[in-house]
Each structure stands twice: as C-alpha cells, then as structure tokens.
Amino acid sequence: MKLKKIIGDVKYELICGDLNVEIDNLNYDSRKVNEKGLFFCIEGYTSDGHDFIDKAVEKGADVIVCTKVPKKLPNCTVVKVEDGRKAMAVMGANFYDNPSHKLKLIGITGTNGKTTSTYMMKSMLESSGYKVGLIGTIANYIGDKKIESHRTTPESLELQKLFSDMVHDKIDYCVMEVSSHSLYLDRVYGIVFEEGIFTNLTQDHLDFHKTFENYYKAKMILFKNSKRSIINIDDKYGERVFKDAGNDKITYGLTEKADLKAENLKMTSRGTEFDLCYRGLREHVKINIPGKYNVYNALGSVAACLNEGISIEKVKDGLNKLSSVPGRCEIVTHNTNLDFDVVLDYAHTPDGLEKVLKASREFTKGRLISVFGCGGDRDKTKRPIMGEIGSKLSDIAVITSDNPRSENPEEIIKDIVQGIKTDNYVIVENRKEAIKKAMLMAKKDDVIVLAGKGHENYQILGDKTIHFDEKEIVSEFIKELF
C-alpha cells in the first residue's frame, strides 16, 4: 500500500522522501521491521523510539514516522506528525482497510469484571448464531481459535491486525476489554463501539495514572466513542458516569434506581439464580459462576445483548452454557474425596479481593482461608489496604508473594502487613509453599481462596519469568498430600 493512502487524513509534514513509497509492514518495535517497512517512533516510559531510527532503517524501514525530526536524516522517507500514538492508530486502521467498521464492537471498562463479562457476552451472542471474537486479559479469540494475549488491550497495530483477521474469518461481533491504559495511550483511538459498558471503579493502576481523577477520566474516554452506554448505577461512580456519558444510556444493578435489575438472588458455590427485571419483563436466570459481583457482570452483559436485539431466551441459554471463566472465582475440580474447596481468582485489587472473599464466605460452611500477595513495581498504596481486607474477611490469611518483579518480596509483604490489625495471619514468602501451608491447614468444609494469579501460568521474580500454574500446583498437592 502507498504511504499516501496509509496516512489518509492524518496531519503531517513531509521532511524528506516520497509519499508514493510502497509499504507492506508497520511496526513500532525496530527489531520487527522488515523490508518495505514503516517505523513509528513512539515515546515510551522507559525508551524512546526516536533512538532506534538507525536500527529500523538497517532492518529495512523505508519510512520513519516521528514527532521529533532526527538531527541526521536517514536515507528514507521521514514524516513528522503531532501525536505519534494517534497517528499510529489511524494509520494502522487505514493499512488494514479499517476493519473495525466491518465489525460490531462491544467495549467494557472498569477496574474489575471485564474478563468475566466478555466471556458471558461471547456465549450469549454465539447462542444467537453469531460468530464472535474476543479480546482480553486471558486470551484473544477469533471464533473458537485461541490466540495468546500479552496485555488486556493490545497496542493499536496489533489490535487492527486482530480486527482484520476477524473480518477475514467472517466474525460478526467483537467483545473486548478496554483498559484504562489503552484509553489513555490511544490504543483504541478512532474506534467506535456499539455498546460501552462500565462495571465499577476502585483503586488500581495509580502507579500509572498518579491520581484517581486521572484514572476516572481515562475510563470515560470509552463512552465518548460508544453509541450507547451501559452503567452499573450501584457503583459509587455510577451516577457520575451516567451524568458524564452523553449518549443513550441504560443502567443496571440490584437497587430500585436501575433500569435492568436482579431480584430474589439465590447463591451457592456453583452459581446464582435470580429474577431479571427490565421494562416489564421478568425472567428467571441462572449463571454458573458464584458471587454477587458476578450477578453484576451478568446484568451488564445482558443489557448489551438485549440492546443488540438478542432474545431473552438466547440470553438465558448463553449464560447457562458458560460453565466457568478461567481464574475467575473458579473452583478447582478433582477426582478425590477432598473435603474442602480451593478457589482460584485473579483478584489483585482491594475491591477484587473484598468481592471474592465475600462471595466465597456465602458458600463456606467451615473456615475461609485466603492466600494472597501484591505485585511488585505497581501501586504500593493498595498493599496495606489489601492486608486489612484479607485479614478481616478471612479466618486465616496466608500472606505471600505475587509477582515481585524487581522488588524485594519481603518488603512487599511488610507493606501488606502494615494494614493488618488482627493476628489471624501467617507469612510464607514462597507462593508454592504458601499454597501447601493453606492446604495442610484446611479442614472439612473449609474454603481456600488463592487470590491474585487466577488464569496466569507464570510468576515474575526479578528479571525471570518462571512457569507457575496454580491449578497444576493444587492438583499436584492433592495427589501428594491427600
């Protein structure tokens, strides 16, 4: 494709070279550039793409798109733009022939609940006969084809490539998690969503956004680019989102003020039944994932599907077909007579930890044992808060490591313990040993909640990433110890 066509309506200044140059690959990583390549110089937080212009040209870049003109011009076309990330998003869309225009997109944002909601919507839409793509934290899907996910919302170039592959495979809908990072960093710039869903807003990512207000403003970008907004009105930020979202709006929740609500909840360890009420409609609904917070996830997902014309029968069928979501309040299954349960959950925020522990308490006949830590090189202010929540809502809390990254695990644990006001906790720094300790402590009818890793099958220790799959570890200990 000619550079001129790729640029499209992006404002630019041609520093040198020719707009008629032929391009067949776009990259922001100089190591991945090939012949006839275009290289975007993106300024990151630890490196600046402008420092890699020479390497990109060596690899075959015929075009450099920059925001700062290099002192020594390379022997290729150089185009200067005002905003590198916005230009990359628009040019990426142009290069792949604007694939998002050929899909119906449903975006979901919020601190917690995004992953489960996308799985619910995928199941409901597929029950109605649609081919559905999914983009999110656990994995990306093009129909049934699973593709590894490296971040919740991909960079704009990878995102447009995914959309293009979905169009090629005749996908009708794409349901996607839209992270605050992706909104702030313009990964979804220029994309229009049929439905934008707000789940909740609680403390997370303040290492990146610095203030809660910045975090809120980043989330709100989704609703400026959605035709309709679906808002959890029970969340403390729900009213504000409702006021700030200027498009067609539907609210959901468990209170009377919600447009779409759930009543008469009956919760067990294997799921929840409730009455769905919406505009004179009352239907009995069953979901196979436990916890009141998953009722909220179901309500937002149902609202989106009803908005899209999916019948209530297909909605119920889709929810019933979804047996579980990996690492989301997932009870580890086994073929033994183990008399306690082990629950895996990705909860890595104060709100997430509180919700999974409260949900687990609902079906715990014995003691509730939690195992959790906090990630290194991330928001430190949430550590003592999680310590307080974990110890207060558990009968026994086992404080351990999560992904320490470059931080000393002992220091992270000290930060967590600062928030603990009780003595019902033990410290076991090694996470595998912490799981073993919890399982050895467990008695009949106890429930162990392993919080923080969920679907992840790795642990980051320093600069090393090791294999660490909690489902495998629990199964291994069941065979070894019981």
From Swiss-Prot:
Amino acids binding UDP-N-acetyl-alpha-D-muramoyl-L-alanyl-D-glutamate: S30, T152, T153, S179, R187
Annotated positions of the N6-carboxylysine modification: K219
HAMAP family referenced in this protein's UniProt entry, alphabetically: MurE
Involved pathway(s): Cell wall biogenesis; peptidoglycan biosynthesis
Record note on modification: Carboxylation is probably crucial for Mg(2+) binding and, consequently, for the gamma-phosphate positioning of ATP.
Purpose of the protein: Catalyzes the addition of meso-diaminopimelic acid to the nucleotide precursor UDP-N-acetylmuramoyl-L-alanyl-D-glutamate (UMAG) in the biosynthesis of bacterial cell-wall peptidoglycan.
Pfam families in the record: Mur_ligase, Mur_ligase_C, Mur_ligase_M
Cytoplasm keyword on record: yes
Localization of this protein: Cytoplasm
Amino-acid positions noted as binding meso-2,6-diaminopimelate in the UniProt annotation, renumbered to this chain: R378, D402, N403, P404, R405, G452, E456
Protein name, UniProt field: UDP-N-acetylmuramoyl-L-alanyl-D-glutamate--2,6-diaminopimelate ligase 1
Entry binding sites for ATP: G110, T111, N112, G113, K114, T115, T116
UniProt-listed Enzyme Commission number(s): 6.3.2.13
Organism, as annotated: Clostridium acetobutylicum (strain ATCC 824 / DSM 792 / JCM 1419 / IAM 19013 / LMG 5710 / NBRC 13948 / NRRL B-527 / VKM B-1787 / 2291 / W)
